[in-house]
Regions:
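Non-catalytic cap/lid and distal C-terminal segments of serine-dependent acyl enzymes
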Residues: 1-187
């Protein structure tokens, strides 16, 4: 299985962030590790074995990233500051990681344009994956979310503000209008 490791300084989060890519071609999949996870968890937890048939046959490329959960969902300091930090991580994914994924996917497959990305995660990674899919369906057009908690109550119990709401799929999907343009993208 072909792998590729890279890191760069992220202006969104203000530090270096690491990514590991598995595969040589195919549909892009963004893997978000379980709570407090790191980019190497996809490999360390032997997900590479489970995904090998699709990765090695060029059906998909998996991009595994770091989380900031230890500074956000798992931390205990002021919830407003924690959710602002989480939103910086979301911006890192949408503004930095997604374009990187789309560029590499195009290069490896000989494609043009902006290919949709499948968001994939387990546990809190599933929560983040679902949030990416529902908030940014123009970028994330597929979702595999296993055993997540899709409300912000888990990381921010008893606290709600605009950013917490924007990161709580149960809450914002309940408030979405049936004629919202995202509804068409979800289906």
């Amino acid at each position: 299985m072909q792998t590729y490791y890279t890191k760069w300084y992220s202006p969104s989060v203000g530090r270096e962030m690491e990514i590991k890519v598995y595969g040589h071609a195919g549909r892009p999949v963004l893997f978000i590790p379980c709570q407090d996870g790191r980019f190497f968890d996809f490999e360390n937890y032997r997900m590479t074995d489970a995904w090998a048939p699709w990765i090695e046959s060029g059906q998909c490329m998996v991009f595994s990233i770091d989380t900031l959960d230890k500074e956000t969902y798992s931390a205990t300091y002021d919830p407003h500051d924690r959710i602002r930090r989480h939103e910086a991580w979301m911006n890192y994914i949408v503004r930095e990681v997604a374009p990187f994924i789309q560029s590499m996917t195009n290069e490896r497959n000989g494609w043009d344009g902006t290919p949709g990305i499948i968001a994939f995660g387990c546990s809190l990674g599933a929560t983040h994956a679902a949030n990416l899919y529902f908030r940014f369906p123009e970028t994330f057009d597929g979702l595999l979310a296993l055993s997540g908690i899709y409300t912000s109550e888990y990381g921010f119990p008893g606290y709600m503000d605009e950013l917490v709401y924007a990161n709580s799929p149960v809450d914002y999907l309940a408030g979405i209008s049936p004629d919202h343009p995202f509804i068409r993208l979800y289906n």
